[in-house]
């Protein structure tokens, strides 16, 4: 064991906070984009909020693809630097940028092609349909800057620099926050663009993040650089990038399919129900994914001590992380339960939305603790090289248990059944996660 490494000797509790604070802030900033957009757009009309809500699965899938390439590049560069293979690390940087631009352009084109049939399947309201097209036609162009800035962020983080990438993320969020009201409502010299203004502000935020990311990458002090001289495309390296980032893509993409599936149930009730779920889900994502930043900080600690054969510190990190995650999820649950009306007011909720939305938020918030526990167990499996078990838990959470629960409870309790499906699915997932963990312990492989 490397006794001079802080992963091996630092107090576990203090180490988790040190490793978690930046990912936690990063996740909070990343998921504040959609919440800010929705909060301002809701002041235009409920139909505008519904349009943004219908667009959310597409933008989520785009983000998942960005994370796919970003994580793959991150893991590959970190490995090469650890092996002191500087040239291979620089070659990976160039491949990552080419993939970010190429895949980003492809997704831009695909989103423009599918958005008409996609929105047509989810709403019969002509105004919502047109607003959705208007919003997504601009947001489609966010994919290249989004994918490039996330790729560069992960490249720089692979060198051990966790702080600098956070600043260009903050800059993008600030631009989005400032320009949203200016462009949506036409304040001062800015034109009133309505829902188009929200999408323009989002793209502007990502563009600034990309420009600052490039400036940072091209700086003299960076440990990795873009390789141009004697560069040639390596198919094996591209395949490794995609393979290494695939688990992260699956975990992030599942929420996109889940939201689309829920919307297909909600469309049978009302557009207000879709607008509500879109607003609520952004609040939930902000809470859950911020906590996920804490979990990300636990992962390298558990992974290091598993590799070092230090089972006591591995289990200590898992227990301490589980306690912190539970505490934060309970805090999130209490916040939603005590302040549902105030949270809905962020989205200028109509009386019709409030009539079912307040109780619906309280029902769905009951799932947070179970979600946190199952995600922590899934991360433990990821750290101990049991990727199959890790992915199985994520599939249970957002697909295998949720879909049947939605179908059955919708039949039994109508609209309330849809909200009940979330805590039911999360509880079942947590039980399965505990059973899988007990099985691994019984086999003495944990």
Task: State where each predicted segment sits.
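Small-residue-rich hydrophobic transmembrane alpha-helices
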Residues: 49-109, 146-165, 276-334, 338-340, ...
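Structural signal for membrane-spanning alpha-helices in multi-pass inner-membrane proteins
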Residues: 111, 154, 180, 184, ...
């Amino acid at each position: 064991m490397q006794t001079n490494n802080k992963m091996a000797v630092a107090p576990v509790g203090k180490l988790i906070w040190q490793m978690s604070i930046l990912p936690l802030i990063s996740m909070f900033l990343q998921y504040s984009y959609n919440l800010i957009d929705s909060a301002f757009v809701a002041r235009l009309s409920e139909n505008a909020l519904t349009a943004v809500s219908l667009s959310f699965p597409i933008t989520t899938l785009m983000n998942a693809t960005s994370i796919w390439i970003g994580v793959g590049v991150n893991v590959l560069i970190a490995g090469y630097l650890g092996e002191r293979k500087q040239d291979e690390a620089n070659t990976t940087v160039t491949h990552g940028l080419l993939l970010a631009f190429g895949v980003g352009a492809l997704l831009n084109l695909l989103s423009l092609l599918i958005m008409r049939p996609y929105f047509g399947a989810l709403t019969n309201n002509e105004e919502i349909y047109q607003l959705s097209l208007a919003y997504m036609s601009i947001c489609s162009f966010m994919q290249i800057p989004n994918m490039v800035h996330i790729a560069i962020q992960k490249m720089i983080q692979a060198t051990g620099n966790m702080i600098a990438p956070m600043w260009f993320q903050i800059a993008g969020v600030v631009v989005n926050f400032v320009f949203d009201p200016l462009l949506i409502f036409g304040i001062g010299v800015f034109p009133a663009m309505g829902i188009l203004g929200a999408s323009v502000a989002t793209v502007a935020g990502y563009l600034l993040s990309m420009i600052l990311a490039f400036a940072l990458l091209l700086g003299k002090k960076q440990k990795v650089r873009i390789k141009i001289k004697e560069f040639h495309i390596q198919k094996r390296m591209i395949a490794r990038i995609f393979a290494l980032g695939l688990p992260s893509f699956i975990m992030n993409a599942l929420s996109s399919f889940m939201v689309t599936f829920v919307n297909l149930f909600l469309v049978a009730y009302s557009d207000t129900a879709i607008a509500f779920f879109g607003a609520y889900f952004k609040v939930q994502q902000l809470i859950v994914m911020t906590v996920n930043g804490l979990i990300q900080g636990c992962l390298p600690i558990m992974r290091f001590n598993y590799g070092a054969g230090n089972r006591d510190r591995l289990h200590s990190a898992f227990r301490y992380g589980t306690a912190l995650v539970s505490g934060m999820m309970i805090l999130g649950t209490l916040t939603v339960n005590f302040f549902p009306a105030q949270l809905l007011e962020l989205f200028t909720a109509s009386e019709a939305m409030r009539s079912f939305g307040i109780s619906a938020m309280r029902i769905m918030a009951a799932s947070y603790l179970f979600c946190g526990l199952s995600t922590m167990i899934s991360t433990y499996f990821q750290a101990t090289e049991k990727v199959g078990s890790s992915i199985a838990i994520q599939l249970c959470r957002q697909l295998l248990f949720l879909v049947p629960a939605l179908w059955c409870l919708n039949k039994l309790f109508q609209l309330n059944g849809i909200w009940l499906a979330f805590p039911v699915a999360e509880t079942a997932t947590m039980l399965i996660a505990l059973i899988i963990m007990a099985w691994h312990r019984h086999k003495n492989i944990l």
